[in-house]
């Protein structure tokens, strides 16, 4: 009952300024929500609130790491299938995004929201692919909020979805 022809991923991080190095913002409790739901079928949605991310505001370099088995589903059986059958999280425990924000400038980060393009790579299920997505960064006081939404195709990452499941 898990139709996963596409994952829709919502990335959301609130990154606070560390005391020592002002040029790097980081968090260990960012959030990723993914959805692979289809109308009229059971909701396939999960959330992970222990995502690590770092942004170097001098270079625009960005990196994020998520432990796959940290995704929480409403239905325990879905979580089990996700980890064991699809993502094989014991073999491929993490997903990583690394990249650079194009035309990023720390001086543009006044209170408010700025939009950038993140170019780099994404590694899921042991497969690394070129990756590009729109990112919005909002500054409020000493914190940055980094948000993005994108669609991934599981077959691009050698994630096999049985036909009986993907045809539902």
Predicted regions and their residues:
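Bacterial Sec-dependent N-terminal signal peptides
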Residues: 1-25
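Low-complexity, acidic/polar, glycine-enriched regions of mature
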Residues: 21-168
